[in-house]
Amino acid sequence: FTNSEVCSIEKFAQKIKDLDPGDIIEFGVASAQTTIEIARNNLDRKLFAYDHFMGLEESSKPLPIHAGWHEGAFRVGDPDYPHIPGSIAGVFKKLEPYPNVNLFVEDVHELKDPSEYGIGKVVAVNVDVDIYEPTVSCLKFLDKCDWDKLYIRFDDWHGHDPQFDHHERLAAREWLDRTGYKFEIPENGHVGGMIVWR
C-alpha cells in the first residue's frame, strides 16, 4: 500500500457516523482524549473502552528508538506525559460527561467474552496499544465479537517506517493471514485505517 493517508482521531470519529448502526471498541485509553473525541461525535453509539492503566508492557519485539515505548510508559500518573490523569479515578472523571462510554479497567490479554460487557454488533475499533503483544490480543478479542464489517484505526501504524514493522502492522498482517478476512487499507500513514470484512 503506497498511500500515506492518515486516519486522525477527528477523521475516524466523523467517519463512524456514516457506518451502519453498531458499537465502538477502544483498546488503550490512557489520557482518554481519543475516547472523548469518538464519544462526543457518536453520542448515539455505545463505546466500550479498555485499559489497565499500568502503561506499556515489555515487548519481545525490537522497539523504535524514538518512540518512548519503555515498560510502564503512558501509565496513569506518568511524569513524562502530564496530559494523562494522575489516577484511574481522574480518567473516569474526564469521561463523566459521556454516558455512552463504558470504561473497563482490564488487561487486554485477560478480556472475557464480549457478551459479558454488553457489546452488541461492532462497527468500529480504535487500537492504541502501541506494541505487538497487546495488539495481537485485541485482534483475537475481535474474533469473538459480532461484526460483518469493521473500520479499525491503528494509532501507531507507521505504514512507511520500517522501525515499526514488528508491532501493529505485524499483528494485523498475522491476524488477516490467520482468519482470511478481506480488507482494504485506505489510510496507510503513521496512523492507519483499515476496513475489514468477515
Ranges and model annotations:
Residues 1-9:
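Conserved SAM-binding loop and adjacent beta-strand
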Residues 10, 14-198:
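S-adenosylmethionine/decaboxylated-SAM
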